[in-house]
């Protein structure tokens, strides 16, 4: 199954483009599911049908689904209380009525990750189009599975679970209670769910498509978003320049100024991205006829994979070089920190800690340089760890 994640700056029509992309694919014979994320039914408004917690058939080959984050939160709370029933009874605590609660901050994102996993693992469709939130929130959402799994491993290392029988003894010796079996079981469940979502994002059939309105603000947002996606190793296929004004706009029209800005930005974008322009219809698209009139680009089956290759230059320079693509990065906004077998990379407002390839774990960082949008990190072999004879 192919997965197309669509995001961009807020207010640039990403939901409309997601709906139109799904419609185009369905009419080309691809069984398509479009997944909405807004609490307001903006996806349904674009498609001309109401969407909600139950999948809705828009037309043959196209289904729309907008998960209910609030209901998912209530269901999760009920399940948690069921598992902790004995502890609650022991404490004399009254159970919370799920209907009286509203979702906590972040519940929407967790619900979307769960829905993304469920939809991608199902076999009912060939293409999943996801209308992600605006770019800043989308980047945090896409980073969540990896970051949360890393935090779980640090807080509750799996290898410590082997000492189940020793926990009561260790607790008495330390004078503090040790983590209970239930805590480790909950962590294992969370890790399993997060791993499934992470595998969908890392799959070779998953790509991100950016939508932006050409102009100064759009250009800045695209540059920042592209950098954030690159640091996460996520593939992008196209940049959709949305709401492009007609070229035959009269010179004395008030639209001539915005058109000039769009032309300038489009020229810059075409030098850096695979850009597809989508015309402004003169009104907000509503319904499948309007979506078809947009003539959005179809799904690109040949998006290039993201690679972070290691180059062996031991014979020439005595180093191994790790190449990390970071388009749009600025040298003054880069930072690297080596921590054991991991490398923390900061680029602009983004940060990621990545495990080192096995060969580089036996090396020390020897420097780094940013050239043509690629960060080249040099590693020198550690004589105490590097095999003799190399």
Swiss-Prot record:
Pfam families: ArsA_ATPase, ArsA_HSP20. It comes from the Bacteria. GO terms for molecular function: ATP binding; ATP hydrolysis activity. InterPro entries: Anion-transp_ATPase-like_dom, ArsA_HSP20-like, ATPase_ArsA/GET3, HSP20-like_chaperone, P-loop_NTPase. Belongs to the arsA ATPase family. This is Uncharacterized protein SCO2128. The lineage of its organism: Bacteria, Bacillati, Actinomycetota, Actinomycetes, Kitasatosporales.
């Amino acid at each position: 199954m192919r997965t197309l994640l669509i995001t961009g700056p807020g207010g640039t029509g990403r939901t409309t483009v997601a709906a139109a992309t799904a419609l185009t694919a369905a009419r080309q014979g691809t069984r398509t599911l479009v997944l909405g994320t807004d609490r307001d039914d903006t996806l349904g408004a674009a498609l001309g049908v109401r969407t909600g917690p139950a999948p809705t058939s828009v037309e043959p080959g196209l289904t729309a689904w907008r998960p209910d984050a609030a209901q998912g939160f209530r269901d999760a709370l009920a399940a948690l209380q069921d598992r902790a029933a004995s502890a609650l009874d022991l404490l004399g605590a009254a159970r919370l009525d799920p209907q009286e609660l509203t979702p906590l901050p972040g519940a929407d994102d967790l619900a979307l990750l769960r829905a993304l996993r469920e939809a991608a693992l199902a076999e009912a469709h060939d293409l999943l189009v996801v209308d992600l939130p605006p770019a800043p929130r989308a980047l945090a959402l896409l980073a969540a599975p990896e970051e949360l799994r890393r935090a779980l491993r640090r807080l509750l290392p799996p290898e410590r679970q082997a000492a189940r029988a020793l926990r009561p003894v260790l607790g008495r010796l330390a004078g503090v209670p040790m983590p209970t079996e239930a805590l480790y079981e909950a962590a294992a469940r969370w890790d399993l769910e997060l791993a499934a979502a992470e595998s969908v994002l890392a799959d070779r059939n998953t790509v991100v498509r950016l939508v932006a309105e050409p102009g100064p603000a759009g250009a800045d947002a695209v540059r920042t978003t592209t950098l954030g996606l690159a640091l996460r190793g996520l593939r992008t296929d196209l940049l959709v320049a949305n709401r492009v004004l007609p070229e035959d706009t009269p010179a004395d029209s008030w639209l001539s100024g915005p058109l000039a800005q769009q032309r300038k930005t489009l020229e810059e974008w075409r030098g850096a991205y695979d850009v597809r322009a989508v015309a402004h219809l003169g009104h907000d698209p509503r319904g499948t006829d309007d979506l078809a009139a947009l003539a959005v680009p179809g799904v690109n089956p040949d998006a290039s994979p993201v690679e972070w290759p290691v180059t062996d230059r031991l014979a020439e320079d005595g180093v191994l070089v790790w190449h990390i693509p970071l388009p749009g990065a600025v040298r003054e906004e880069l930072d690297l920190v080596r921590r054991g077998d991991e490398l923390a990379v900061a680029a602009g407002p983004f940060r990621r800690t990545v495990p080192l390839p096995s060969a580089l774990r036996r090396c020390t960082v020897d420097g780094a340089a940013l050239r043509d949008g690629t960060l080249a990190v040099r590693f020198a072999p550690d004589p105490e760890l590097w095999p003799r004879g190399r």
